[in-house]
């Protein structure tokens, strides 16, 4: 299973005390393939370093980069699907380039993808993805 994880979802999941932590743990341990691009990775890094402990941020980024289960993509096409927040296009573009099964986000800006026939991107909330990966582990 391949997934692109929205920055805010990844941010809450890297905290070991968060109930969403399995999203991060399963990404680096092979529960699913985390799909990232350089622009997503840079956004993760920027947000993490601003919002959490610097060491935790650096460790999380390194874990994602060096995990053999992380798949890196360099989207060649910008589909410009997220008109409400064009900065979020990097996530949908990566999901399309990766052929990801899911784009995981609680952000309403991605609702437009539910109405887009092509290219198709399945957006699911963090809670649903969490339940999916937890049930897969059991």
Predicted regions and their residues:
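Acidic, PIN/NYN-like endoribonuclease modules and their adjacent C-terminal/linker elements
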Residues: 89, 108-138
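Conserved beta-strand segments of alpha/beta enzyme cores
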Residues: 33, 69-71, 122
